From Swiss-Prot:
The lineage of its organism: Bacteria, Pseudomonadati, Pseudomonadota, Gammaproteobacteria, Enterobacterales. CDD domains: TatD_DNAse (cd01310). It comes from Buchnera aphidicola subsp. Baizongia pistaciae (strain Bp). This is Uncharacterized metal-dependent hydrolase bbp_325. It comes from the Bacteria. GO terms for cellular component: cytosol. Keywords: Hydrolase, Metal-binding. Binds 2 divalent metal cations per subunit.
Amino acid sequence: MFLIDSHCHLDLLNYNKIHTGIQDVLNKSKKKHVNVILTVSTSIENFCYLLKFIKGNRNVLLSCGIHPHYIPENKNEILKLKKYSNNEKVVAIGETGLDYYRNNDNKKLQQILFREHIKTSITLKKPLLIHTRNSINDTINILKEENSKQCIGVLHSFTEDMHSARILLNMGFYISFSGIVTFKNSKIVHETAKFVPIDRILIETDSPYLSPVPYRGIENQPAYLYDTMLYIAQLKNMSPECFAIQTTKNFLKLFNLPSYFTNMS
């Protein structure tokens, strides 16, 4: 079996008490068949740190983006986004998007920043990693306005209903599910996971957040992707092996990666 964690934040894991270092995290992951990890940046400063942190590890892929929580005051950060995203180690643009849950006061700034990421994605032909919280209508509208058919991407840790999923799927986007799908009360997410076609699903941990059952209350890590995979496979009446094969194919296709990645287990 070969699994890929399509979204996590490796630098935020607890390296004081839980892990001895990044290699320790990767070793634990491989024991659970998680062989490739996409670690996601949330700011330009964070991207520069991650570039050094992953130390050229072939099993760890990297994105470049500015999370809506970290809107830069300096416009030069936007120029840096475009410059650094062109780095050959970068396979995706983001994490970007809209988050109205914590901050309603800067909607316009979030939207401007999101549009810049979309334009960068189209220019560089690298997929978007999209964050949307309490903002699905604006997210969809902006993607349409920016001619998103020229770019591709994934809605990460998706928690919206089937209607929103259908619109995004018709626009060509992929849908990624995190440990939230394993929560007993996440009925909407369960139904959406059943609905999304198997050739358009990705899976993720969003480590160190959103630990799946049975690890709720414990810091999340890429190894726990295995449990999320098992849960969704059961929801879709698929064998874990077939589900793992298809989600890995989906990841490689979306991020335009060669199949030799699957020989790195």
